[in-house]
Swiss-Prot record:
It comes from Mycobacterium sp. (strain KMS). InterPro entries: UPF0182. Belongs to the UPF0182 family. It comes from the Bacteria. The chain crosses the membrane at residues 18-38, 63-83, 114-134, 176-196, 211-231, 260-280, 288-308. One of its GO terms (cellular component) is plasma membrane. The lineage of its organism: Bacteria, Bacillati, Actinomycetota, Actinomycetes, Mycobacteriales. Residues 902-937 have a biased composition (Low complexity). This is UPF0182 protein Mkms_1433. Keywords: Cell membrane, Membrane, Transmembrane, Transmembrane helix.
Amino acid sequence: MGMRPPARMPKLTRRSRVLIGVALAAVVLLLIGPRFIDTYVNWLWFGELGYRSVFTTVLLTRVVVFLVVSLLIGAIVFAGLALAYRTRPVFVPTAGPNDPIARYRTTVMARLRLFGFGVPAFIGILSGIVAQSYWVRIQLFLHGGEFGVTDPQFGLDLGFYAFDLPFYRLVLSYLFVATFLAFIANLLGHYLFGGIRLTGRNGALTRSARIQLVTLVGILILLKAFAYWLDRYELLSHTRGGKPFTGAGYTDINAVLPAKLILLAIAVICAVAVFSAIVLRDLRIPAIGVVLLLLSSLVVGAGWPLVVEQFSVKPNAAQKESEYISRSIAATRQAYGLTDEVVTYRDYPGNAPATAQQVAADRSTTSNIRVLDPNIVSPAFTQFQQGKNFYFFPEQLAMDRYRDADGNLRDYVVAARELNPDRLIDNQRDWINRHTVYTHGNGFIASPANTVRGIANDPNQNGGYPEFLASVVGANGAVVSPGPAPLDQPRIYFGPVIANTASDYAIVGENGTPREYDYENNVETRNYTYTGSGGVPIGNWLTRSLFAAKFAERNFLFSNVIGENSKILFNRDPADRVEAVAPWLTTDTTVYPAIVNKKIVWIVDGYTTLDNYPYSELTSLSSATADSNEVAVNRLALNKQVSYIRNSVKATVDAYDGTVTLYAQDETDPVLQAWMKVFPDTIKPKSEISPELQQHLRYPEDLFKVQRALLAKYHVDDPVTFFSTSDFWDVPLDPNPTASSFQPPYYIVAKDLAENNNSAAFQLTSAMNRFRRDFLAAYMSASSDPETYGKITVLTIPGQVNGPKLAFNAISTDTAVSQDLGVIGRDNQNRIRWGNLLTLPVGPGGLLYVAPVYASPGTSDAASTYPRLIRVAMFYNDQVGYGPTVRDALTDLFGAGADATATGPAPANLPDGQPAAQPPNGQQPAAQTPGNQAGRAPTPPPAAIPSGPSGPQQLSEAKAAALQEVQEAMSGLQDAQRSGNFAEYGEALQRLDDAMNRYSEAR
């Protein structure tokens, strides 16, 4: 019986082919069109920022990698198919008219080019798309250098592990995938074209099929042998369950490492055995070789190390692992910047008795005790400084420091008054208003962290609110800048609040009369036209069409508010802008505003990281940086594993024009040096950091939190003690009853621990508990001062000194404290909130805990229930101090005179936006006497501090009259501030300035 001819495929009509072609073109356009639009938009955006070289370098690298890998993988797969086709048998018997292989063969032969070129091309393109995402690894291989440090096992420079080994592993994985796909393609090709037949008793295999398949299997085994070679080096950075450190341990060095070499030799022997089938024509030999390799990997690769671990290491693990633990301790300290050159350990009693005079003598700490919690006072900022419904402050504010008129260092709670488009209402929300009228924020607000306005002895009194210094656009467009530093341009076009909305773009530029809302006076609303250099021009129809497509908004094409001078501001988040121009950086989760050279800039910390530093502990950024503040706002770091981190870059983003500037902070970092070769001229040297900017650089929070988590273990020098964990520390939990995670570190101005002198320094601090206990083990401080920046001081504390939880429990359960707060919060009239519990070294060797207490109306968290400071609680050596002010609490705790150098509250009638008037001739305002508290006798008022040998001075008649004018001017300024009239506010501010001048001139 003859074989039935195969059925022909039905032909499509011309109309059907056209429709299918149009549909495919539409699909391709929908898939690729947005990519081209985004690419061109990014081209314009990077060019406007001055970082187009970054865009082109990344794009070119991705394209080259895509093309190379696509062609390589596609060619290898094509070769497997082509060889199977070209060496196919001339005659292939069939199993009858219903032979499925024959039908498939006929279909493939009818569309040979489609299958022969289409399948390899598809696989190659997919491989290229995946491979181009590894452009970072490739660039580091091409530009990486040496660390100047060798690993303790193989003696190789660490640059090999950081830059070379990841690339070799990447190449190996792609060669393995390509060879395996070629094997599958060749196998299927031979089966389809008759080189392999499964019919009959034993089947059939042509010589060509045998040679090709055996060769590919042999290549796979050789690649596996090379993988065993690379595995040896990766042992130095791997983790294994049950091992208390990262890197190769006793079992790895004495069992796994030799096993890798044995398996390598077996793999080479097996590869030779497989290749022998080319000549010997016996497939049993390669089959035996493959089985031998599999069995060897189980017995030698897994069984032997398991036996060594169970019977040699575990019975005496501390001694067996001690050498390798020492390696891990040294490597982890080096990788995370915790070496002896950076970290200084000092013994500190922690519970030394202190007299009132000793506490008062510690002026650098007691005069700067922080009572404002930046995570609580944001609603108060909103209530007093918001101004308009569309201005907004973040939920958590920032800490920074400035010097006052006398040159004293003070810490401030700072915030930029940004625009929040989500708070626009009614007709403010239409496209024109949202994107062309309400375009920017206005103002930099700072509050001294160590004082408040007035005293709130009673919840109904007007006191306890922050003292605001508001630098804003005032009457007639003049900038009102009372401090903490002079500011010329308070308008804010770039910031995290502005960017935290969908479609955060603004259209600015000169196009007729000014359109952007700026301020109001008692007559009219005054508008503004953006004059900054930032923004992508959209004056021509091409760019307007481009952005209309990008944002799916037709108003770009039809609105007359866009003219030839118009520009668009977008991508306005400072951290996102830094990550875009430096895609190799990991940025800190917090950015903060600062006044630098009379401009508002956002400061962003950038990290270079590695995940394969030999013997260094592998750490999760998201876990190590999580604390109660981050959890409260759901702001966690990337879930990224690192074993090396450096704060290599400090970046600034101009809040007005969006300019991004990158500075090299750690010029010795080999990873940074590699990226500076990849992107030359994009990072400025450290020497170009201006002194003004240097004064506002903070030791970054995320780095500090990672370091304290590691220092909890890696402060231990002895490997046996390390293994036992007996001397480990813990990061304490936040004792605040509303918290649910670790206690965050706190920025404070206090005694300089880095220099160990009596000067004040801005530092980031954290207490450390004993392992799984609530007693203190250490106190950690990282300096942010320019002279000692990055120096970490650790005060090690012996004995049983109460930690944060025990201190807070003692405060909150104190009879006087609990009864007083119970009265304030009775019947849900006020919500009591505990502020951050600060730990401060004071006196000859003690630790003072300070917790501000806030009250707000009602029990909700709404912004309208703005909190104010109602009490200050302290704890020192099992004693509790309590009162309405820092001075009262110090006096209650240590006795009269302890408050002599503490900062008192500002006048209660202090107007918004103005600093507290200083008492004449250096006199300090006396603290008010606290009321008769339950369970505690009234505290006597402290004596006035003499300004000189003759004691406190009396005001002259002229001086007293001038002081009265100052108070009247302050009252007028407060009324103007409350009215919201910027014109009256400016006039009142001028009257206050004149009154202050007359006061200073009076005799």
